Structures are given as structure tokens and as C-alpha cells.
Curated annotation (Swiss-Prot):
It comes from Aliivibrio fischeri (strain ATCC 700601 / ES114). GO terms for cellular component: cytosolic large ribosomal subunit. This is Large ribosomal subunit protein uL6. Keywords: Ribonucleoprotein, Ribosomal protein, RNA-binding, rRNA-binding. It comes from the Bacteria. The lineage of its organism: Bacteria, Pseudomonadati, Pseudomonadota, Gammaproteobacteria, Vibrionales. It holds the Pfam family Ribosomal_L6. This protein binds to the 23S rRNA, and is important in its secondary structure. It is located near the subunit interface in the base of the L7/L12 stalk, and near the tRNA binding site of the peptidyltransferase center. The keyword rRNA-binding applies. One of its GO terms (molecular function) is rRNA binding. InterPro entries: Ribosomal_uL6-like (IPR000702), Ribosomal_uL6-like_a/b-dom_sf (IPR036789), Ribosomal_uL6_a/b-dom (IPR020040), Ribosomal_uL6_bac-type (IPR019906), Ribosomal_uL6_CS (IPR002358). SUPFAM superfamilies: Ribosomal protein L6. Belongs to the universal ribosomal protein uL6 family.
Length: 177
């Protein structure tokens, strides 16, 4: 059995938490996040910690409590520090540039690709071959980065495409005659 739910989430200074039934709102320096948690979880705030527990008589209550704890912990980290994903474009002529609230990509297609950014997500291009996606919602930052990567995933022979900065692309050997 996982014991994730047994550890309380510590609320750092400068972060405000509001509980309204199963809805939790966390406000901090980087923004505000709201989430409705599963009914199988009992949430309570004690001083500067949030404690999670299972509701009696629910089969998978401990699993749901662990999931809720992980989600709330990510919300607290997000509004306090924020999350970042870095992407690298590798290939001849592959470029990225900001166009207002969208990322413009040149990825070898016959047309340029523009990806509009959702609210709460910021992106910047320090160089033409790098994209840095930042925001306070971990799930949304990861989803935007995955969407940008999906336009041209790294191919296995030369490794060309859009990749995460920490991603290792395994390359295959070309077919021999």
C-alpha cells in the first residue's frame, strides 16, 4: 500500500489556501489554482498543513487520497515556484519564434505551424532552436510542451525533430546493403 496520503502538505509562507467542501483554491505569487477533489477523500487544514485521509466505506479511498495529496502538493509548488519545460529543435532549418501569444514553428513542412498558448502559460524562445514553457499548473505546462513536441517528434535515424531538453533519443543504424 502506498503511504503518500499519510504525509501532510506543508503550506509555505505567501501561499493562501481556501477549502470549500471538496473544492480547494490555492493562491500564491505565481497565480491561483482551483481543483475539485474526489468525494472519497477527506481534506482538512491544520495550521500551515493540509491533511488528507480516506472516507469511511469507500473501496479505493486510500488511492484517491494519495492522488489528491500529489495534486495539491503540485498546486502548492506551482503557485509558489512555478514549473518549466524546455524543448530543443534539432534539424536543418528548424526554428521557433514568439508571435504574440503563440509560438511560431518552422519544422520543414510546406507551411509554418503556429501553436496558440492557453491562459496561464508563458513561452519564450531564448534562441531560435529553444522553447521554454513556464506556468503554475504542472499538468498544463506538460500538455503544452507535449503538444509542441507532437508537431515533429524526434525520428530514430538522425534524431531530427522537437525534443525535451532532458530527453535522450535512441538512434537506429541505417539499413546496410
Amino acid at each position: 500500500m502506498s503511504r503518500v496520503a499519510k504525509a501532510p502538505v506543508v503550506i509555505p509562507a505567501g501561499v493562501e489556501v481556501k477549502l470549500n467542501g471538496q473544492e480547494i483554491t490555492i493562491k500564491g505569487g505565481k497565480g491561483e489554482l482551483t481543483r475539485v477533489l474526489n468525494d472519497a477523500v477527506v481534506i482538512s487544514q491544520e495550521d500551515n498543513t493540509i491533511v488528507f485521509g480516506p472516507r469511511e466505506g469507500v473501496t479505493n479511498a486510500w488511492a484517491q487520497a494519495g492522488t489528491a495529496r500529489a495534486l495539491v502538493n503540485n498546486m502548492v509548488i506551482g503557485v509558489n515556484e512555478g514549473f518549466t519545460k524546455k524543448l530543443i529543435l534539432k534539424g536543418v532549418g528548424y526554428r521557433a519564434a514568439m508571435k504574440g501569444n503563440a509560438v511560431g514553428l518552422t519544422l520543414g513542412f510546406s507551411h509554418p505551424v503556429e501553436h496558440a498558448l492557453p491562459e496561464g502559460i508563458k513561452a519564450e524562445c531564448p534562441t531560435q532552436t529553444e522553447i521554454v514553457v513556464t506556468g503554475c499548473d504542472k499538468q498544463l505546462v506538460g500538455q503544452v510542451a507535449a503538444d509542441l513536441r507532437s508537431y515533429r517528434q524526434p525520428e530514430p535515424y538522425k534524431g531530427k525533430g522537437v525534443r525535451y531538453a532532458d530527453e535522450i533519443v535512441r538512434t537506429k543504424e541505417a539499413k546496410k546493403k
